[in-house]
A protein has these predicted regions:
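Long, C-terminal-biased catalytic regions of enzyme "large/alpha" subunits
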Residues: 1-341
Length: 341
């Protein structure tokens, strides 16, 4: 694209190579590499080049990426705009082949944003590395969010306690520590500003599928749907109660003033790939397990996984043998071919 002052820009994707390289040389304790996600509007002139990221021979091989899609663009595609249909097909094909790009429906995020954002005209343009938070950003604010997850394997005990309220308060305390520690660090001004003015936190869950299996409830059953609704209503109600109590005790940040809240957001469903495995080999987040016997490749090593609830069932039927587990492994973790189930 041409530059007003003269010359020509190499385009958005060219500059993404810089972020990809920077992330590649950053590590957490020499174990986990840095990560970065780029979001680009689907109507951007460089989107076709963008969709070639991670392809064989492409300069960018590690970076996560996403397209942002508006309602008006989708309506045009559905109404038959051939260029939009062809581009959408390319997005879906790429996603089928690689898992990328994420698809972020921008208008959905803004329509469902907290009142404190909508009332103040604050716009959400993109999400984060794992697409679990929807927060606004602007020149002097770069969004940050403190995350944690409830282990639903323990839900029957959690619901009898104040664990949800306690976790909400804990996350707010973590945010306060971040605000204090980043106050005078160079180049952290934008994230510090966001943390101080929003105090956004995100409580999620892990072990949803494990909880269902422990109670012999089918993942797609009506019972599971009703249970899902009940659990998240409880989490929402309790987290709202906690942030309101915090506002009364400690005050409201800039963008919550007049709303009776300490935090602009309280919930977020993160993927929890590693943490769920550490916490009792629970299923990740709200997702189903992709098999009953497989090798888990995590930051700190490779670990074999045998579904503990299936193991208990096999023990009941006298079928918990190496031969049975080998047949499950050879079937990609599936038990559909086992005649006794």
């Amino acid at each position: 694209a041409k530059i007003n002052s003269g010359g020509e820009s190499s385009g958005a994707v060219h500059f993404m190579e810089l972020f990809d390289r920077v992330a590649a040389v950053v590590s957490q304790g020499n174990v986990r590499r840095g990560s970065f996600a780029a979001y680009l509007p689907i109507e951007h002139p460089d989107v076709k080049e963008f969709l070639r990221i991670r392809s064989e021979g492409n300069a960018i091989q590690e970076m996560s990426f996403a397209v942002t899609v508006t309602d008006s663009w989708m309506r045009g595609m559905i109404d038959g705009d051939q260029d939009k249909k062809d581009l959408w097909a390319s997005v879906i094909k790429k996603r089928y082949e690689t898992g990328y790009p994420y698809i972020f429906f921008q208008d959905n995020a803004n329509n469902q944003a907290p009142d404190c954002y909508k009332d103040q005209g604050m716009k959400i343009y993109a999400s984060n590395l794992c697409n679990e938070i929807s927060l606004p950003s602007k020149e002097d604010e770069s969004f940050v969010c403190c995350l944690s997850s409830l282990n639903l394997i323990q839900w029957d005990e959690i619901v009898k306690t104040d664990a949800i309220e306690t976790l909400t308060m804990f996350l707010d305390a973590v945010m306060e520590e971040y605000i204090q520690k980043t106050e005078h660090i160079p180049f952290m001004e934008a994230s510090h500003n966001f943390a101080k003015r929003h105090r956004a936190i995100g409580m999620g869950v892990l072990g949803w599928h494990s909880y269902l299996q422990s109670n012999m409830i089918s993942f797609e059953s009506m019972e599971a749907k009703l249970l899902n609704s009940s659990i998240f209503k409880k989490i929402r109600k309790s987290s709202d109660k906690a942030t309101e109590e915090l506002a009364n005790l400690l005050g409201e940040p800039l963008y919550c003033q007049g709303y009776g809240r300490r935090n602009t957001t309280t919930l977020a469903i993160a993927p929890t790939t590693s943490s769920s495995f550490i916490l009792g080999q629970a299923s990740p987040s709200i997702e189903p397990l992709n098999g009953n016997y497989f090798t888990k490749d995590l930051a700190k090593g490779k670990f074999s996984y045998r579904n503990p609830y299936l193991k208990s069932l096999l023990e009941e039927k006298g079928k918990d043998t190496d031969d049975v587990w080998l047949s499950i492994l050879n079937s990609g973790g599936s038990v559909q071919r086992l005649p006794f189930l």
